[in-house]
């Protein structure tokens, strides 16, 4: 129906693979099917858990995180805006062949002036192009993990008020209540994903 839905919640001390694997396995055990797409950052623990539990699902590396990650490979501060614009130029292509062509063009552009950046782009940017396998009218919503980041920010903001928690169960209760409220808002709110078109 195009509505967002929270499928589960978990409390863990880290983003280690074992925690993600446990969470994703619990979703599978509850009967959640194989997703058509998983969008996330490139955290190694999460990537390993996805391979172990949802290997059949295509993975889209969050384009926003890719933009941020590129900063580490830019040799001069004065190049930051240009590089950001070039990455956006790739992401805003009409289709995958055009995105690949633009990527090759940009990699070539930086091969001499910023070889580490060019190598990083060549290896990392394709992970953010999986979205081109999906209809154009839903790509914008699925190309980043911003929805999850916003959700996590809301949880942090509302749990910070409570301060310290005596045990894991108490924080899980509060987080679950917060997520139930948000889920109800989503269910009664606007459609998040438009009906899929064939083009």
Predicted regions and their residues:
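A detector of single, family-specific signature residues
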Residues: 10-20, 24, 28-29, 77-81, ...
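Conserved structured core elements
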Residues: 14-21, 40, 44, 81, ...
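A generic short alpha-helical patch detector that favors 3-5-residue windows
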Residues: 12-16, 38, 62, 75-79, ...
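RNase H-like nuclease fold core
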Residues: 1-39, 44, 48, 53-56, ...
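Mobile genetic element proteins and their domesticated derivatives, centered on retroelements
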Residues: 4, 38-41, 50, 65, ...
């Amino acid at each position: 129906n195009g509505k967002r839905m929270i499928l589960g919640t978990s409390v863990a001390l880290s983003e280690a693979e074992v925690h993600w694997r446990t969470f994703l396995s619990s979703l599978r055990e509850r009967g959640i099917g194989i997703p058509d797409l998983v969008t996330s950052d490139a955290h190694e623990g999460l990537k390993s858990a996805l391979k172990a539990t949802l290997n059949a699902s295509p993975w889209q590396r969050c384009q926003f995180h890719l933009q941020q990650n590129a900063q580490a490979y830019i040799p001069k501060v004065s190049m930051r805006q240009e590089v950001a614009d070039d990455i956006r130029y790739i992401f805003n292509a009409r289709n995958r062949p055009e995105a690949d062509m633009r990527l090759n063009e940009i990699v070539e552009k930086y091969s001499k002036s910023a070889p580490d950046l060019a190598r990083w782009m060549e290896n990392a940017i394709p992970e953010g192009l999986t979205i081109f396998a999906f209809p154009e009218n839903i790509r914008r919503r699925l190309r980043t993990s911003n929805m999850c980041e916003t959700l996590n920010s809301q949880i942090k903001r509302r749990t910070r008020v409570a301060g310290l928690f005596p045990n894991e169960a108490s924080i899980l209760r509060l987080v679950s209540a917060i997520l139930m409220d948000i889920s109800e808002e989503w269910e009664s709110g606007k459609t998040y994903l438009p009906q899929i078109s064939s083009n």
